[in-house]
């Protein structure tokens, strides 16, 4: 790998990070706008035209707030916790493909040695396995935040969140196993390409896996109706209680990054990813560009679904949450692996 290739890769990584941060910023605005619509009010509309500068105002607010350290906290672990959550969210995003390969112009091929531009930072053979392995590490940031805060509300929220994430990682992962059985690959690009003729959602094992995945997805991202870790009426804001300013912003952004990543993953696993429907533009240079637009349209729907569910459904009780995961989702996930195995045989 020469210096031109390294520089090109660094620029692409920086661009993808900028896209993710910008998407998170405007996702917060979109959520507040949708919440306002559902509650029959306008939402943010003071910063810029239609409130479009509200994310910038919020970012400046978080960056300029005074950094306060409560006297009882373990400072080193207290600072490490939000960094772990943010790092895991960024690393999980790095293997998500946004589209197919785009051929580069000749002058750029000569300078970089690359023929195609992959619309993802990395494409390892263990793509989906890497994504869930990194996502599962985020639980360390949460439990460290609760423990280092030396606050009973923070600790209770962290314990709840840890138990919830570990419990729902099982059905989430097992639902993906059935898709891996159907497609025969762990690479997200291969899983998307295998759905060129028929989306996985229209196959029996794929439909069951989709239902399991969506429920577990809400629990994994700590969103309503599974936000037991941040139950305001019981735990103030859970493991966030002692965090403010930029440290809280890292947790906040990581949560929205995870929601966007999960929306991308559910699109890639069940809804054809970036495949252009009906074979339109097959082999054409614009196929990748149109594939990107179709992919983003599906992702926008699932990001909207997160918001819609948040402002529609009430919170589960903790015992209901655990019962649903261990008594309902996990048995169905195990059964679906068997169904997927039989499906490819017959």
UniProtKB/Swiss-Prot annotation:
Q: Which UniProt keywords apply?
A: Cell inner membrane, Cell membrane, Membrane, NAD, Quinone, Translocase, Transmembrane, Transmembrane helix, Ubiquinone
Enzyme Commission (EC) number = 7.1.1.-
Q: Which domain of life is it from?
A: Bacteria
* Membrane-traversing stretches: 6-26, 76-96, 128-148, 166-186, 198-218, 260-280, 289-309, 324-344
Give GO cellular component annotations, separated by semicolons: plasma membrane
Q: Which InterPro entries match?
A: NADH_UbQ_OxRdtase_su1/FPO, NADH_UbQ_OxRdtase_su1_CS
Question: What reaction gets catalysed by this protein?
Answer: a quinone + NADH + 5 H(+)(in) = a quinol + NAD(+) + 4 H(+)(out)
**Pfam families cross-referenced by the UniProt entry:** NADHdh (PF00146)
The answer to whether the entry has keyword NAD is yes
Topology in the membrane? Answer: Multi-pass membrane protein
Localisation:
Cell inner membrane
Tell me, what is an example of a GO biological process annotation in this record?
aerobic respiration
The keyword DNA-binding belongs to this UniProt entry's keyword annotation: no
- GO MF terms, alphabetically ordered: NADH dehydrogenase activity; oxidoreductase activity, acting on NAD(P)H, quinone or similar compound as acceptor; quinone binding
> Whom does it interact with, and what assembly results?
NDH-1 is composed of 14 different subunits. Subunits NuoA, H, J, K, L, M, N constitute the membrane sector of the complex.
Q: Which family does it belong to?
A: Belongs to the complex I subunit 1 family.
The entry's function note states: NDH-1 shuttles electrons from NADH, via FMN and iron-sulfur (Fe-S) centers, to quinones in the respiratory chain. The immediate electron acceptor for the enzyme in this species is believed to be ubiquinone. Couples the redox reaction to proton translocation (for every two electrons transferred, four hydrogen ions are translocated across the cytoplasmic membrane), and thus conserves the redox energy in a proton gradient. This subunit may bind ubiquinone.
Question: What PANTHER family does its record include?
Answer: NADH DEHYDROGENASE SUBUNIT 1, NADH-UBIQUINONE OXIDOREDUCTASE CHAIN 1
This protein's name:
NADH-quinone oxidoreductase subunit H
